[in-house]
Amino acid sequence: MYQSLAMAANHGPPPGAYEAGGPGAFMHGAGAASSPVYVPTPRVPSSVLGLSYLQGGGGAAASGASSGGGSGGAPSAAGPGAQQGSPGWSQAGADGAAYTPPPVSPRFSFPGTTGSLAAAAAAAAAREAAAYGGGGGAAGAGLAGREQYGRAGFAGSYSSPYPAYMADVGASWAAAAAASAGPFDSPVLHSLPGRANPAARHPNLDMFDDFSEGRECVNCGAMSTPLWRRDGTGHYLCNACGLYHKMNGINRPLIKPQRRLSASRRVGLSCANCQTTTTTLWRRNAEGEPVCNACGLYMKLHGVPRPLAMRKEGIQTRKRKPKNLNKSKTPAGPSGGESLPPASSASSNSSNVATSSSEEMRPIKTEPGLSSHYGHSSSMSQTFSVSAMSGHGPSIHPVLSALKLSPQGYTSSVSQSPQASSKQDPWNSLALADSHGDIITA
């Protein structure tokens, strides 16, 4: 925009084209080139410039023409350029964002002096500062505009020369702020455990209260269960009733079903072989037919069906011996067996001695004179000699019985000390013989 003004100032018509004034009626080329007022404000978008000058273009041109006419003595807005100045500014504002300067025309009207151009630039800067929030200069206007924009609320109203543009932006920002603030104000975050709102926490804590409060199954009345379930109406069910309802679709019956009949009394079953209905164990044959335990075992062991003649009305049980008796007898048996061999050996030895002695005594009794020929032991010879000398037959029998019983009487001593058995036997017989001899002789 300012470049077009500079070009118009440099390449404008010569003095006196439209006015009768001297060279001061129009701005000079050198002054226009060196004037600092033609520097545009920093980072001002063209759309804002177009919108800002859309309404004030004609007024600025009129004020510039009137000031120029007053200073230079030219009639105010009398030339045709003044009449065509407003269409030029309005065309520039109507273009919007893409601003294109109008073509340079010799009939375009400009202010007469450099001072009037400076006043026009100052007025434009003031309007821009007012639009951005009332800053002193170009940089101050930009900073103040940013601060004013940052401090403004999302739903606030803006007083600006372009209300349509900022109203749309403000409305969109307000809607975005409301949308972004919506999730944070929703009751979802208030129900988090970290919140201090007890009313919002209560619904979430109901799940944990189920474990602390006492529950009762509405179907069976159970007070404890591994897992609490709920039916379609929300009532509590124990794990068993809940699973039954889930699988079968009906409530679990409260009456417990009767126990399955024992195998011996199953209704409708009979042995395919013997036609019995009572057994301790039902089996199946090769064809899959039920058979009693007896027929099934017989077929399994012998490979042939059990004969009907072996059928019995009652169930025959096996007579088992008690295991305690076997355990009590087994430890006593070996001990008795171990103690028996020495006793048997001692008794056999003693019996052998007794038989030999009895055999020797028999010929002695018949032939007393031959007693000297059987001198096996002094005790025996003394005994036989005493008996022979006395000649009393009946008195000899107690001695013989004592002699026969003496080995048996000392079997216990022999079993206790078998080492001294050989030495004690002659001495025992001698002592008995002497004692009986004394009795006999007396």
From Swiss-Prot:
GO cellular component: nuclear body; nucleus; RNA polymerase II transcription regulator complex
Biased composition (Gly residues): 62-73
Keywords: Activator, DNA-binding, Metal-binding, Methylation, Nucleus, Repeat, Transcription, Transcription regulation, Zinc, Zinc-finger
Biased segments, Basic residues type: 317-326
Source taxon at top rank: Eukaryota
Zinc finger (GATA-type): 217-241, 271-295
SUPFAM superfamilies membership: Glucocorticoid receptor-like (DNA-binding domain)
Quaternary structure and partners: Interacts with ZNF260. Interacts with the homeobox domain of NKX2-5 through its C-terminal zinc finger. Also interacts with JARID2 which represses its ability to activate transcription of ANF. Interacts (via the second Zn finger) with NFATC4. Interacts with LMCD1. Forms a complex made of CDK9, CCNT1/cyclin-T1, EP300 and GATA4 that stimulates hypertrophy in cardiomyocytes. Interacts with NR5A1, ZFPM2 and TBX5. Interacts with TBX18. Interacts with PHF7; the interaction promotes GATA4 binding to its transcription targets.
Entry function: Transcriptional activator that binds to the consensus sequence 5'-AGATAG-3' and plays a key role in cardiac development. In cooperation with TBX5, it binds to cardiac super-enhancers and promotes cardiomyocyte gene expression, while it down-regulates endocardial and endothelial gene expression. Involved in bone morphogenetic protein (BMP)-mediated induction of cardiac-specific gene expression. Binds to BMP response element (BMPRE) DNA sequences within cardiac activating regions. Acts as a transcriptional activator of ANF in cooperation with NKX2-5. Promotes cardiac myocyte enlargement.
Name of protein: Transcription factor GATA-4
Source species: Canis lupus familiaris (Dog)
